[in-house]
A protein has these predicted regions:
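Conserved phosphate-binding elements of NTP-dependent enzyme cores
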Residues: 1-918
Length: 918
């Protein structure tokens, strides 16, 4: 029975209030609502979990033991559920071998393509390497006119331990009667064998060409014999001519024997194809060019090469500078403008100067001197493998080409350019037949990657360097590539990290997934995606304990009329106001000559003491500018140590009033189930002390540690403060039972008897932050209330004090970090805060609260810089830096800077176009 909808009955997981809701089948459905209202609980923890569980239940018990054990979610029943696929916004892999190409399977098809139709070219002459088969020789013979007399010859080599006479005797015994020597045929006779011959050929057969099948069969046998006797070589020559045609069944040219292409030759995960030096990683521990030339804006003359500074070592630099004119080396050109060949020359050296490679080798040879060991250690780091130059494959793999390009050349092209390469690829009919299916798969997958807005990535980009939004969209493209039908796709905010311009393409992808015959369910706050949805479910009305109900369900038009927060913001009845005036400030930081990744040597000024937003389409260079240049550069300026800094020339500006810089990302605040928001913001210590000071606690000699579930003392000994006991059931889901000893309250009975104003420690941990703030204010515990207040300000009032950090979303984790800074910010320190997409997972109403918190930080004298795509956030900024124009190689330029009003007037800026609509 196939129902028209998926019906969820009585969902009660987390804060869901026993809800029943129908989701139309084969439609694009958006689940929206405030952060913490229960959207993910419904979509992932109920619907997806049940879909997965039913699939696993259908397998044999033998297969089940190898799979994760799945709990049954708290729901009465789900009718009409389909197989479920969840695509979440986590960077899934930390494996350094995984690349965009391998995770989307495009690379697997490329390997096959090169193995099937790639041609091998000699690096010496550039000629194609071919090996001949018996058929090639037969075809060559058949091209002669009927009746032509030919000789089939095989070259003979004399082994070291034999004489010419012995070899000829052996040939005679094998039934051969003639040899060709110096263009004349000599007949072999037992008693009169020639003694001192060099370079002669054996006549394997004399043939008269006939164009019939019998002749071809006889000839093929003879050619086989000729190849055997000639150790892979043979010749044909007309009986009365002197010109010979050479054939070889060995894969060689220019004195090199080449490897025949097969799939493993192109795999860097296979020992056969991987570069032997770096094992296919592309980088090794060695001399790090970024440490040797830390400032690429300097020229060799200006001491760009750090190890060659100072009195002792400057001799090496002087050698190069004084002799540079002899080999035309530009010593006054900045390092970043040098060609790859010129940089390689500095490494390799020549007869006029010692290169860096030999310079460091000398140091290694004399490493018994302590100063040499120190110098070597200073310039060591992870660096590109010098053997394969980061291409990961053994050099033989790059001799194989299609249309002049090796597989390494192709994976270094942005996906958009790769698509053009395959569109313009000219193949012979035979190659077309062999490669037809492979090309179809490659082109489809590349198209999907372009459709989800990732056309700027290259296939050799490592998976662990992608942002959460990028890796989610790669998973989405991979799912599209597999073209499943009749499934249920559940996506967690696919618009994260996407500029509004790219969201339109994403909507196209979601619709094509739906049109294949799938139900696409998206947890989303983006207005454009809601407009495109067939059906919207709004969960609310508020968050936490005040949420968990379906407050509206229907089309976009129906939602506009609904009396819910989502409806009010969408219809304009509620709105995030544009600030009355924009701040200005004399303090600023300027980065001069930014050229890391795709940045085009730009100068960028970040004003301080205000809200600055960095925008631009996906892949335009925002993260590079802020995460790889600004953040580590300021850390270094303030002597805070820090990460490796990307490439730029210098830092200028008025920023000496800053005492520190904080990068607030979306990584979880704690993996342990015992970690919770109040331990992170250091409020739990005060609460434990408060309980330890109660009369009963003093009588029982309890200290504050007795009120912690992380150390022995007061916590329940049976469940170790977890509140539940896990029983492993071999083939079924682990059963989580409430601990019988403490009844799920985590503490010993005698600890729970200690009360403060009618609440014990367990009651308090189950109180929401909103209620706890009111409770502590009422009982004059203002210190604790003040510490909890920032959590309320950032919109986390719905979270309970003891909620496990492992259940928080990325957006919630980021806001807890923000709250911890807000609670600390009474100090006189001036801090620069950098946020990476803080609106992730936020409803319009939550964005409003977040903006208030950020404005509060700025009012306290701090500076805030944000990477953001959300137009509500951008329009509230004091200053906007827009990068572009496109992503990848076409990005990295400064398109516009100024107030949001100035950006909106800029004709070139994509961001401006979407700001106008606001």
């Amino acid at each position: 029975m196939k129902t028209e909808e998926i019906l969820i009955k009585g969902a009660k997981l987390h804060n869901l209030k026993n809800i029943t809701v129908g989701i139309p089948r084969n439609k694009l459905v958006v689940i929206t609502g405030l952060s913490g209202s229960g959207k993910s609980s419904l979509a992932f923890d109920t619907l997806y979990a049940e879909g997965q569980r039913r699939y696993v239940e259908s397998l044999s018990s033998y297969a089940r033991q190898f799979l994760g054990k799945l709990d049954k979610p708290k729901v009465d029943n789900i009718v009409g559920i389909a197989p479920a696929i969840a695509i979440q916004q986590k960077v899934n892999t930390s494996n350094p071998r995984s690349t965009v190409g391998t995770s989307t399977e495009v690379y697997d098809y490329l390997k096959l393509l090169f193995a099937r139709i790639g041609k091998t070219y000699s690096p010496i002459s550039g000629q194609e390497v071919k090996k001949h088969t018996v058929t090639d020789v037969v075809d060559a013979v058949m091209r002669y006119p009927e009746g032509t007399k030919l000789l089939l010859l095989a070259p003979v080599s004399i082994p070291k331990d034999r004489t010419v006479e012995q070899v000829l005797k052996l040939l005679l015994q094998q039934g051969y009667a003639r040899i060709l020597y110096k263009e004349e045929i000599i007949r072999l006779e037992e008693d009169n064998l020639p003694k001192n011959l060099d370079n002669f050929q054996l006549v394997v057969d004399r043939v008269i060409v006939r164009h019939d099948e019998d002749f071809q069969h006889r000839l093929a046998d003879a050619v086989d014999t000729a190849f055997f006797e000639g150790k892979g070589e043979c010749y044909i020559q007309e009986m009365d001519g002197v010109v010979q045609t050479h054939f070889s069944n060995r894969f060689e040219l220019d004195g090199i024997t080449f490897l025949e292409p097969n799939v493993h030759l192109f795999s860097f995960n296979n020992p056969y194809g991987a570069c032997p030096k770096c094992d296919g990683y592309g980088d090794t521990i060695g001399l790090d060019e970024d440490l040797i030339v830390p400032n690429t804006g300097l020229s060799v003359y200006e001491n760009a090469i750090y190890p060659w500074r100072g009195e002792t070592m400057s001799w090496f630099r002087d050698q190069l500078v004084n002799n540079a004119y002899k080999f035309d080396f530009p010593i006054h050109k900045p390092w970043f403008e040098l060609t790859d060949e010129q940089k390689q020359l500095v490494w390799d050296g020549n007869k006029y100067f010692t290169g860096l490679t030999d310079f460091f080798k000398e140091l290694e040879d004399k490493s018994y001197k302590i100063q040499n060991r120190v110098l070597l250690a200073r310039y060591r780091g992870k660096t590109r493998c010098h053997e394969c130059h980061g291409k990961r494959l053994r050099k033989e793999a790059n001799y194989v080409k299609i249309a002049g390009k090796s597989i390494s050349d192709l994976v270094e092209l942005p996906i958009e350019e790769l698509q053009i390469f395959f569109k313009e690829l000219k193949l012979t009919d035979y190659e077309q037949e062999v490669a037809k299916r492979l090309l179809l798969e490659i082109n489809n997958r590349l198209q999907f990657l372009a459709d989800v807005g990732l056309g700027y990535l290259t296939l050799n980009r490592k998976s662990n360097t992608l942002s959460g939004g990028e890796s989610q969209r790669i998973n989405l493209a991979t799912s599209l590539g597999s073209s499943l039908v009749g499934s249920m796709y559940i996506l967690d905010e696919p618009s994260i990290g996407l500029h509004p311009r790219d969201t339109e393409r994403l909507i196209g992808v979601l619709k094509s997934l739906r049109d294949l015959g799938n139900t696409v369910i998206v947890v989303e706050h983006d207005e454009d995606i809601m407009k495109a949805a067939d059906y919207i479910i709004d969960i609310g009305p508020e968050a936490g304990t005040h949420g968990g109900e379906v407050v509206a369900a229907g089309t976009y038009e129906e939602l506009l009329k609904a009396d819910t927060l989502t409806g009010k913001y969408l219809s304009g009845r509620l709105a995030i106001e544009v600030p009355k005036k924009r701040r200005t400030s004399p303090q600023y930081i300027t980065l001069v000559g930014c050229r890391e990744n795709n940045l085009k040597n730009i100068d960028v000024t970040f004003p301080l003491d205000m809200l600055t937003v960095v925008t631009g389409v996906s892949g335009s260079g925002k993260s590079t500018l802020v995460k790889k240049l600004l953040y580590p550069a300021i850390q270094k300026e303030l002597d805070l140590g820090g990460e490796k800094i990307g490439q730029f020339t210098k830092i200028e500006g008025k920023y000496k009033h800053l005492q520190s810089v904080e990068f607030v990302d979306q990584n979880p605040i704690g993996k342990s189930t015992r970690s919770n928001p109040i331990t992170y913001i250091k409020a739990y210590d005060d609460i434990r002390t408060l309980f330890a000071n109660q009369k009963l606690a003093k009588m029982r000699n309890f200290q504050s540690k007795h009120f912690s579930f992380n150390v022995d003392g007061g916590r329940c000994e049976v469940c170790k403060g977890e509140g539940e006991v896990t029983i492993e059931m071999q083939f079924m889901a682990d059963v989580h039972l409430t601990c019988e000893a403490c009844g799920g309250k985590r503490f010993k009975k005698e600890v729970l008897e200690v009360m403060y104003e009618g609440k014990n420690i367990d009651d308090l941990l189950n109180t929401t932050i909103d209620d706890a703030v009111a409770f502590f204010q009422k009982h004059k515990q203002t210190k604790i209330a003040e510490k909890l207040k920032p959590l309320q300000d950032v919109g986390l009032g719905y979270v309970t004090l003891g909620q496990s950090s492992s259940t928080l979303s990325g957006g919630e984790a980021q806001r807890i970090k923000l709250a911890s800074f807000l609670s600390k910010s009474d100090s006189k320190e001036k801090v620069l805060f950098i946020f990476d997409e803080p609106t992730t997972g936020l409803h319009f109403h939550d964005i409003r609260k977040l903006l208030d918190s950020l404005q509060a930080l700025i009012e306290k004298g701090h500076s805030v810089i944000i990477i953001e795509h959300n137009t509500e956030m951008i329009k509230s900024a004091d200053y906007v830096i827009d990068l572009g124009l496109e992503g990848g190689a076409k990005g990295g330029n400064l398109v516009a800077t100024g107030t949001p009003e100035e950006i909106a007037k800029n004709k070139q800026s994509y961001t401006g176009k979407y700001l106008k609509l606001k």
